[in-house]
Design a protein with these regions (language model features):
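A residue-level detector for the "anchor" residue at the start of short, highly conserved motifs
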Residues: 1-188
């Protein structure tokens, strides 16, 4: 499933016509919502060409077609996103209930499940800026992780980013994790 630049939906490379606007009171950029059931994960291409891998138990809200001024999506759960460089002059923003990530051309993982007080962002390549609930900004470089608790910065450290995105290939890498975390990951 993917979106073309004009906002039309592509399923198996076949174009599905976008919904026609009545012009009265409708949003200029209608929002879509995708909810991935437990035990599943899906891939999604946004209208700008950015690729999302969406993990189980995750909700993503995104526009059918991005605004000209900025690109913004909302996440509750875990995604890996590879932001396209075609429109690098247009900011790409990922919002969660706990923090905001301003993308500076990159690929990264966001983990912010609604039921968890702890959240994290791991950078694979490029550069991102994470803004916590206290409006503090933290810049990440490749193979760095920022941890937040209830939306507030708690830690920044060097990691092997590939360990944090192995879920995309159906592999859980849980080195030195507490049993409670292992069980939580297996549940999802």
């Amino acid at each position: 499933m993917a979106y073309a630049q004009d906002g039309s939906l592509l399923i198996d490379e076949k174009k599905i016509a976008p919904r026609q606007s009545t012009g009265e009171g409708e949003e200029e950029h209608p929002m879509n919502q995708i909810i991935v059931p437990m035990g599943k994960h899906i891939k999604l291409q946004l209208s700008d060409g950015s690729q999302l891998d969406i993990n189980s138990g995750t909700k993503v809200v995104y526009p059918q077609k991005f605004k000209k001024e900025y690109r913004e999506i909302f996440v509750e759960g875990e995604i890996f996103i590879d932001v396209t460089h075609k429109e690098s002059n247009i900011p790409f923003i990922v919002k969660t209930s706990l923090f905001t990530v301003n993308v500076l051309g990159t690929a990264f993982n966001v983990k912010a499940y609604k039921e968890d007080t702890k959240a994290e962002v791991v950078l694979v390549r490029g550069k991102v800026e994470v803004k916590d609930k206290k409006e503090q900004n933290y810049t990440l470089m490749p193979n760095e992780l920022i941890a937040l608790n209830e939306g507030t910065y708690t830690d920044k450290k060097k990691v092997n980013a590939l360990d944090y995105i192995s879920w995309i290939d159906g592999i859980l890498t849980l080195n030195n994790q507490a049993l409670s975390i292992v069980l939580e990951q297996l549940h999802r």
